[in-house]
Amino acid sequence: MFITFEGPDGSGKSTIIQKVYDYLIENNYDVIKTREPGGSPIAEKIRNLILDTENIKMGYRTEALLYAASRAQHVEETILPALNENKIVLCDRFLISSLAYQGVGRGLGIENVRNINEFAINGVFPDFVLFFDVDPITTLKRKSSLDTADRLEKEGNNFHERVYNGYKEILNSEKNIEIIDATQSVEDVFSQCIEVLKRRNVL
């Protein structure tokens, strides 16, 4: 079972994926938690290149291709082997993030970004997606400081609004999306996720 956690920066998905992972471990499920960009030694090196705040001259196409390259390695080295061992895979970001951030946020076009990423993942799609729905104004308020923000997190409000609107556009055409109200408390959001996992027969 392959489950991805998607949402804008500051939506709380990284906190919740850890709680879901801990819950599954405590209940003796065979599960791994991973992230994008990154998730394997080579993919993590690509992550560092993408998010380094010194790489301000990185072109948008370069950025999109690096995300796809990281994803290809991540699938081959981490995700697919785990799925072949019948493990539950929880992944913090996947394909839809690239469609929203590079396809819409960077203006490269959803279909252009989809094409390079579908080549990268080679047919390995999530069984379903948990989308953490919260508007960009709220997410920006949640960030205590930009001092530790990465290159994309440092983008202005207009960029993050485009990304959020991109997510909304993409969700209308994608299947197997579960909308999580991420404006609620951590415990309430966690409970929503557990209910989805039960309904989806993961638990």
From Swiss-Prot:
Lineage top rank: taxon: Bacteria
GO MF terms, alphabetically ordered: ATP binding; dTMP kinase activity
A Pfam family matched in the record: Thymidylate_kin
EC identifiers of the protein: 2.7.4.9
InterPro entries in the cross-refs: P-loop_NTPase, Thymidylate_kin-like_dom, Thymidylate_kin_CS, Thymidylate_kinase
Key words of the record: ATP-binding, Kinase, Nucleotide biosynthesis, Nucleotide-binding, Transferase
GO cellular component, one term: cytosol
Entries under Gene3D superfamilies matching the protein: P-loop containing nucleotide triphosphate hydrolases
Chain positions recorded as ATP binding sites: 7-14
CDD domains: TMPK
Class of enzymatic activity (EC top level): transferase
Catalyzed chemical reaction(s): dTMP + ATP = dTDP + ADP
GO BP annotations, alphabetical order: dTDP biosynthetic process; dTTP biosynthetic process; dUDP biosynthetic process
The keyword Transferase is assigned to this record: yes
Purpose of the protein: Phosphorylation of dTMP to form dTDP in both de novo and salvage pathways of dTTP synthesis.
Family classification: Belongs to the thymidylate kinase family.
Protein name: Thymidylate kinase
